[in-house]
Amino acid sequence: SSELKVAIKKIIKSSPLLEKHFKVMRSEIRCLMCDTEYTPLAYSKDKLDGKLAHLFLADEVGAMDGYPVEAMRSSQITLKSKLGILISTQYPNDDNGLKDEIDIAKKQLDGVYSSGKKYFALLYEPDIELVPDWKTNDSVLYQSNPVAVDNADLFSELKDNRQLAVLYENKRENFLCKHCNIQYKGVGSEGYVDLISVQNCSEDVPDEFWRGKIV
């Protein structure tokens, strides 16, 4: 949230026409025209329910669970014109707030779901049939990074990173998630299976299987 504040501050400072309408303070950015404030909020699991947001901007949603976004949406329930902006690359963890947002956008695009609300999404990810060929197919890079179509330097850098990701497993997760928007769990990702799931399948596994296991 503080990084977003810095970015907004730079935009305001770059334009004399904008600057006179805003007051940039240490803890917030205030719009003098309509007396509203932009306040950076730190991630929390249970302390966002009391906030009232006319508009919210969430960056790196994939790094969070769904609670912060849902808390902000709940705070807007009485507003006629609701607005929330979500920005993120892909992340390897399964419990992230980005997955549902992508699914909702695709379901609305396919006509499977319609909430009656305006929902605008820019999804930069490769076609699913191209994903298995990420090591060699340049279309994966172009679809995930459309700015690279007209930027030869960026495309060359992406190809170099792809080559390293092919050669080194420990570089693969970052490349696929951050530069291709493909969810991938590489080496070093922490795996977790809850106890209830283990208990449900324990009867189907011989007792010898569990002996000597490091947990």
What are these regions (language model features)?
Residues 15, 24, 41-42, 70, ...:
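Residue-level detector of functional hotspots within protein domains
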Residues 59-63:
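Walker B catalytic acidic pair
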Residues 67, 73-215:
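Non-catalytic, compositionally simple segments
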Residues 46, 64, 93:
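Glycine-rich nucleotide phosphate-binding loop and flanking beta-alpha elements
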Residues 3-54:
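Inter-Walker segment of RecA-like/P-loop motor cores
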Residues 55-57, 85:
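Structural motif
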